[in-house]
Amino acid sequence: MLRISNKIRFYCKIAAKSDLKSKLDFTQLRHPTKVPQQPEPNAFPDLDNNTDDDPIDSKTIQLLERLSLVDLDSEEALKTLKSSIQFANRIVDIPTENVPALYTVLEKQQLQLRNDSVTEGNCRQEILRNAKITDEDYFVSPPGNIPLEQQNE
């Protein structure tokens, strides 16, 4: 119990040292992740060379902007959207009939877990000091990249 309490206090100390302008240094944490640090190479290298242009009408773009809170007015955003659609169309063609379903990509790896027990952290105020805006001991996040004036309409 004392060992787990010391670990939680260690994380609280790291959180207390960080301020609004800096992020946590995850290399200081004691449990390294098994998730790859670098992205995997593109499974479809010829995807960018595909000139299969499916027209996307303005109503679809407006719907996607509203649902995803992402501004798609720039050419780069439309290019990324078209590339994502082409990638999704290619994934559909991959034969997966004889492939067993996975719950996670790390299914066969041993993960480092700790006992799920309640410990005394008592560092709520230290952690909440890192938030720019708080409300009733909760973090307040921005509503996305849509200005607040548009939300009232």
UniProtKB/Swiss-Prot annotation:
Keywords linked to the UniProt accession: ATP-binding, Ligase, Mitochondrion, Nucleotide-binding, Protein biosynthesis
EC number(s) per entry: 6.3.5.-
Annotated spans, Disordered: 31-55
Pfam families per record: GatC (PF02686)
Gene Ontology MF annotations: ATP binding; glutaminyl-tRNA synthase (glutamine-hydrolyzing) activity
Taxonomy, superkingdom: Eukaryota
Annotated localization: Mitochondrion
GO cellular component, one term: glutamyl-tRNA(Gln) amidotransferase complex
UniProt keyword Metal-binding, yes or no: no
BP GO annotations: glutaminyl-tRNAGln biosynthesis via transamidation; mitochondrial translation; regulation of translational fidelity
Catalytic activity as recorded in UniProt: L-glutamyl-tRNA(Gln) + L-glutamine + ATP + H2O = L-glutaminyl-tRNA(Gln) + L-glutamate + ADP + phosphate + H(+)
Primary location group: mitochondrion
Principal EC category: ligase
PANTHER family xref list: GLUTAMYL-TRNA(GLN) AMIDOTRANSFERASE SUBUNIT C, MITOCHONDRIAL
Self-association and partners: Subunit of the heterotrimeric GatCAB amidotransferase (AdT) complex, composed of A, B and C subunits.
Family (UniProt): Belongs to the GatC family.
Function as written in the Swiss-Prot or TrEMBL entry: Allows the formation of correctly charged Gln-tRNA(Gln) through the transamidation of misacylated Glu-tRNA(Gln) in the mitochondria. The reaction takes place in the presence of glutamine and ATP through an activated gamma-phospho-Glu-tRNA(Gln).
Note: This protein may be expected to contain an N-terminal transit peptide but none has been predicted.
Name of the protein in question: Glutamyl-tRNA(Gln) amidotransferase subunit C, mitochondrial
Lineage: Eukaryota, Metazoa, Ecdysozoa, Arthropoda, Hexapoda
